[in-house]
């Protein structure tokens, strides 16, 4: 199974990806996480350091694939999760999609691409071009990381459009949204009402999730010395269980930009009416159930 994780830049994709990878490993799966970001820091919380990228390794070998060994590019992380960083082209030059393609090509050359139960692609920022949508070519499922904010959901809608486009030619489905570090989900629910898709989990607004990134540790590793964090790990284990159940997923139909802008901005500009509408719907549902 191959999973591509997308979301607005800075939303917490790498932190979430690392914890999902650990959760999958805790369920007995052999997991490879591939960071697809020029910053090459996707796997930092798994390994505790910035591992060399595949592009750097290939450059040092003059792109002689036969001179590259698995241990040159695959690093063992916490919990037995294997880690790879694709890296990226120089700033302002090249294509990130090419880098992803070279990474997959090398892993196939090393007979490593098909050795894992789950491969998770952690992809940078928003999908702004076909190049960075490249991991969707290999994925069975896409997961979108968001929060309860305007910008993150606007980005999620653009990613949903990319999933729909790729699903025309690939067996790709959207597994769902993951709300990261948010105390509310009303705007998420409003968006999902307009663009139907599953919400896999909404992670609590706790500082430890952000701090784990700075410490270079996953929540699972931190929980070994801070048992109070075990309840947070259950959220990631729940996501892993849903993924491993091989959900049907959806091919989303994104909301047109202007319509989405109006929908989300109205929620901010007229909060009282939006909340009263939602309360009215809840009351109606209760009445029907009685």
Swiss-Prot record:
Membrane-spanning intervals of the chain: none
Catalytic activity of the protein: chlorophyllide a + oxidized 2[4Fe-4S]-[ferredoxin] + 2 ADP + 2 phosphate = protochlorophyllide a + reduced 2[4Fe-4S]-[ferredoxin] + 2 ATP + 2 H2O
Annotated ATP binding sites: 10-15, 39, 180-181
GO MF term list: 4 iron, 4 sulfur cluster binding; ATP binding; metal ion binding; oxidoreductase activity, acting on iron-sulfur proteins as donors; oxidoreductase activity, acting on the CH-CH group of donors, iron-sulfur protein as acceptor
EC primary class: oxidoreductase
Task of the protein: Component of the dark-operative protochlorophyllide reductase (DPOR) that uses Mg-ATP and reduced ferredoxin to reduce ring D of protochlorophyllide (Pchlide) to form chlorophyllide a (Chlide). This reaction is light-independent. The L component serves as a unique electron donor to the NB-component of the complex, and binds Mg-ATP.
Name of this chain's protein: Light-independent protochlorophyllide reductase iron-sulfur ATP-binding protein
Gene symbol of the encoding locus: chlL
